[in-house]
Amino acid sequence: RRAGKIAIVLDDFGGGGHAIAARFCALQQPMTLAILPNEGQVSDLSNRAHANGHQVLVHLPMEPEGGQDPGEGAISVDQDNKEIRRRIRQALKKVPHARGISNHMGSKATADERVMQQVLNELKARNLLFLDSRTTANSVAYDMAIDMDLHAYTRDLFLDQVDDIEAIEARLWDLAGIAARAGQAVGIGHDRKATLLALTSILPRLETRGFRFVPISRLLP
């Protein structure tokens, strides 16, 4: 029976309640917390996650299709190269222990080669990783990052598009199936109670079947 490595990335931290964040940080299995850089208590949350053995990413707001507001400090396609790079440096400074960046929204920005070149250049200069959340099939980010020899990853599944414990548990089993076939898998969830309860229930059961939970940087790019 084959198992594999699983990285679970939890998005949108920093904007929610501190109580739920503390409970995610208390999970025994290593998680990767993607923290919005311009929300309150970002530094405290990042320090706590790191101290508890979890990995930290900057969850960088990026421009989506359709005009929805991605949040303060977002990267957009109408910014010049200098401004894009300034915003990335600023975001990285705000989140201690960050091992890289993932995109928050960003269906427009991640499809733009010029924009992504600036993002990836900043990461390469610092030996940081990029996770493409794949909010659009048109994203060029992952392929560009691989071509530039960055450590880059892309998600296999969103875990909690349906905010229901049983639905999320089923997605975790699906994710394990991918890891069993491919040797590794990346699942993205969010800082929600149903997600926390599903992880608490399913992760120990997957561990008994030989699956290993690791920070995202421990996967093969």
Predicted regions and their residues:
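Active-site beta->alpha N-cap acidic-glycine motif
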Residues: 2-72
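Structural preference for beta-strand elements that scaffold enzyme active sites
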Residues: 5-7, 30-34, 55-57, 98-102, ...
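Glycine-rich anion/phosphate-binding loops
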Residues: 38-44, 77-86
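Active-site-adjacent loops and short helices of periplasmic peptidoglycan-processing enzymes
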Residues: 64-65, 77-79, 108
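Structured catalytic-domain cores with a bias toward divalent-metal coordination
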Residues: 173-176, 183
